[in-house]
Design a protein with these regions (language model features):
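SAM-dependent Rossmann-like transferase core, predominantly class I methyltransferases
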Residues: 2-39, 45-58, 222, 237
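A structure-centric signal for secondary-structure junctions around beta-strands
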Residues: 6, 21-22, 77, 217, ...
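A generic structural signal for alpha->beta connector loops
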Residues: 8, 37, 77, 103-105, ...
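General small-molecule cofactor/ligand-binding pocket signal
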Residues: 12, 81, 107-109, 203-206
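S-adenosylmethionine
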Residues: 17, 25, 29-30, 87, ...
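Conserved SAM/SAH cofactor-binding pocket of Class I
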Residues: 29-125, 131-145
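SAM/dcSAM-binding transferase cores
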Residues: 215-259
Length: 259
């Protein structure tokens, strides 16, 4: 059995279509999480890693804000729903959730984003999310991966697109809600344009580069309903002079064993 060990939880990493990866961990560590958040949605959860990171961060914040007295206490205070179109990934995520300290707050569901949206409408609950997050597929033009499940996890032509995510967010975010995504840097212009078309505005962007001499290859972009004239704009360098940078180690300190 392949197990990826973080400081406070473990992830079974055997069968999911998308394994634990740097992009996902960066999103989980860097996205904005508030102690006032109650309803969170992970779209394309894979192993469930980002949802687990969100749970850990929320309970740390809540404890500091005196929202809850125990790490697994007040289960009604936080609900994280994690969906994926791949049934095997959902089974693995559910197992990882069950083995975590926050198992009462995490739920894995086998559904596409469209199916999940329809189910929300069918329930008539008017449920809104304070945070939606995703590490969506991004290989629009590349050759399709040979294995179909991994193909769906990596390619927008067969799976989820950021356009769908933004359109869903426009309908299902709470008034103060945010959507956070990790994507290739070259998608920035189209991403922000499509967000504006859906009434969403960039308030924070983290530009990720592997080493100082290279241009950013990834962005973590965060949007809300509220206009922001000067979005927070930060550059993160992963490695410097052959070792992990201090800023990267600081960002991932609560998760990676080596940080």
């Amino acid at each position: 059995m392949s197990i990826f060990r973080f400081k406070r939880f473990e992830v079974i990493n055997d069968r999911s279509a998308m394994k634990v990866n740097t992009d996902g961990v960066l999103l989980g560590a860097a996205m904005t999480v508030n102690p006032s958040d109650r309803m969170l949605l992970d779209v394309g959860t894979g192993t469930g890693t980002i949802a687990l990171m969100a749970a850990q961060r929320w309970f740390d914040l809540a404890r500091n804000e005196n929202v809850g007295s125990r790490e697994t206490g007040m289960p009604e205070s936080l609900k994280i729903t994690a969906i994926d179109i791949d049934e095997i990934s959902v089974e693995e995520a559910a197992r990882n959730f069950a083995n975590s300290p926050w198992h009462e707050n995490l739920q894995a569901q086998h559904a596409s984003l469209d199916e999940f949206s329809v189910s929300l409408q069918g329930e008539g609950s008017g449920e809104k999310f304070d945070l939606i997050f995703s590490n969506p597929p991004y290989f629009d033009e590349s050759l399709l991966a040979p294995e179909q499940r991994r193909c769906n996890a990596r390619h927008t032509s067969t799976g989820l697109s950021y356009r769908e995510l933004l359109e869903f967010a426009a309908e299902h975010l709470s008034d103060g809600g945010r959507i956070s995504m990790v994507l290739p840097a070259e998608t920035e212009a189209a991403l922000t344009r499509h967000a504006r078309m859906n009434g969403l505005h960039l308030f924070r962007i983290l530009r990720v580069r592997t080493v100082p001499r290279k241009s950013p290859s990834r962005i973590i972009a965060e949007f809300s309903r509220h206009r922001c004239d000067e979005p927070e704009d930060v550059i993160l360098t992963i490695q410097n002079e052959g070792k992990y940078s201090e800023e990267y180690l600081s960002l991932t300190h609560d998760f990676y064993l080596f940080a």
